[in-house]
Amino acid sequence: EGTPLEQEVTAADFIPEAPCGTFRDLKGGDAFDLGGTTIEIYDCPGHTLGSVVMLIPEERSVLLGDACNYFTFMFDDYSTTITEYEESLKRLSGELAGKFDTVYLSHGDGNGHKEIMEDVIAVCEDIKAGNTDDIPFSFMGKRALVAKAVTPQMGRRDGGRGNIVYSKDRI
């Protein structure tokens, strides 16, 4: 008895593992029905080459995940260049125009603002123009730059929303 957090969790509580061969890659244009709720997949290469975004039309919600958020990592070998990322975001923003009111992210409290894509596109443009603060950043042995200076709470000092961690050799 007790609350779910107080109960013993066993292997039977989990979904059984499936052999890897039964999974298939998600790609832009895919859609699936979860019993009255549709998930539409949109490509958004940037953070990773295979990044995707999910639109839930019935809820007018979009799950951007790591593809576009308040502190997007764009500095590793598995990321696109900033220029390619900006192109992805512009295309995605056009494809999703008027289709969502709610944005979900994969970090922080999970809530994003409706204009996050446009705000991150502006950061891409600032990076390309050299209009950045370039704060040194290290993560898992990799060195990069934070485009816009941040507060201790990781919000932008200039009051803007959206930021990119990038490498000058991947613009």
Model-inferred region functions:
Residues 38-126:
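Metallo-beta-lactamase
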Residues 26, 30, 50, 163-171:
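Short flexible/disordered coil segments
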Residues 90-171:
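Accessory terminal helices/loops
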Residues 4, 16-19, 45, 57, ...:
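Proline-rich intrinsically disordered, low-complexity coils
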Residues 16, 25-27, 34, 61, ...:
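Intrinsically disordered, low-complexity regions enriched in small/polar residues
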Residues 1-33, 70, 125-129:
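Active-site HxH/HxHxD metal-binding segment of metal-dependent hydrolases
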Residues 14, 23, 32, 71-75, ...:
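Phenylalanine-focused residue identity feature
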